Amino acid sequence: MSVTLINNENNARYEFETIECTRGPKAVDFSKLFETTGFFSYDPGYSSTAGCQSKISYINGKKGELYYRGHRIEDLVAKYKYVDVCRLLLTGELPKNQDESLEFELELRHRSFVHESLLNMFSAFPSNAHPMAKLSSGVSILSTLYSTHQNMHTEEDYQTMARRIVAKIPTLAAICYRNEVGAPIIYPDIARSYVENILFMLRGYPYSRLKHTTQGEVGITPLEVEAFDKILTLHADHGQNASSTTVRNVASTGVHPYAAISAGISALWGHLHGGANEKVLLQLEEIGDVKNVDKYIARVKDKNDNFKLMGFGHRVYKSYDPRAKILKGLKDELHQKGVKMDERLSEIAAKVEEIALKDEYFIERNLYPNVDFYSGTILRALKIPVRFFTPVFVIGRTVGWCAQLLEHVKSPQARITRPRQVYVGD
């Protein structure tokens, strides 16, 4: 099938082939548009442009659906652990049995330690440096420790590179946090599961499972591990978003893969991308009380006010974000099972959501709660500091970046990214 483009100036007709998709709309192959017509396509933000063909994740924005390699996100969250989802994204296959699942996880656990020299680098940062700045730098430094990943040839080479960074990113992130607060570094405990180990490195004390002495709480509960596991799964991949596209673009230059991942971390840092969950919680704090919600909703509608309600709306979803639905259910479940929530912020969030889902202003603009709206309150309940919300996103998304990178570098269509411009200067 083809599409005909007609130039109304000279009635010239040009035929362009379409590309079939297994899900979603077809695409028109405009790769030879300039060569054929002398025109570029102009698409700021690339909202109508597909830069690659992918088998990793698919979003149906109208129906509110998300798939990882053909599997519904709801099924993956309900039936599989995050490490199983990592295996799916990297290899295309879920584990066939518990032994395969454990084998993959044990490899991640054993690769979780980082070179001691990295500790000196983290200590050199100012105490107020944002953890995302430190994390991006730490991953970039990893490229100097594993220079062989610059030249990969076999599938085993690619998988080793990806599994190594997926294993080490939680350790690097935990070091960033503990370095910031001046707490002793907690080394990975390979006797713990991959996900429990993350909470342990963030909240633990050396030689003890004690978390917060003032609250008299000991250990990390299975319920907390399960909740955190689901959060990571929900953040594992999400199509060609800004950070994933950044990883692909940087990788297209032939750079070390960890440098491309570092660039993805920098892209995710932005408050319009991964930093949004941090902004949601800060905004709920700003609202302060349920009685103030109406006033802030009015500000959203005021054309003369630049105030934006964080945690609502999405570039792709024009209905309820399926990840947000899952997180809302998870938040309610944690509350019912006795996990301590910030009641004040939870009440404010519930009131904001109640109004937004009924108000025509939000409905007409497809402003539904997104994944960031609920993740912050859950992370706080898991005693994750607000400044560390975005690094948690990095932990979950690193495997998706690796999958995107591998798909790009192994594609026969791979070439260095070089967009055009419409020059309007002198």
From Swiss-Prot:
Membrane-spanning regions, if any?
A: none
Task: Identify a single GO molecular function assigned to this protein.
Answer: citrate (Si)-synthase activity
Short name of one Pfam family for this protein? Citrate_synt
Gene3D superfamilies reported for this sequence: 2.20.28.60, Citrate Synthase, domain 1, Cytochrome P450-Terp, domain 2
Checking PROSITE patterns in the record gives: CITRATE_SYNTHASE
Q: Which pathway does this polypeptide act in? A: Carbohydrate metabolism; tricarboxylic acid cycle; isocitrate from oxaloacetate: step 1/2
Identify which residues the record assigns to the active site. H314, D372
Alphabetically ordered keywords of this record: Transferase, Tricarboxylic acid cycle
- What is a biological process (GO) this protein takes part in? tricarboxylic acid cycle
Q: Show the GO cellular component annotation of the record.
A: cytoplasm
> What reactions does this protein catalyze?
oxaloacetate + acetyl-CoA + H2O = citrate + CoA + H(+)
Q: What EC number is given for this enzyme?
A: 2.3.3.16
Q: Which PANTHER family has this protein been placed in?
A: CITRATE SYNTHASE
Say which family it is in.
Answer: Belongs to the citrate synthase family.
Misc note: Citrate synthase is found in nearly all cells capable of oxidative metabolism.
Q: Which NCBIfam families match?
A: PRK05614.1
Entry protein name: Citrate synthase
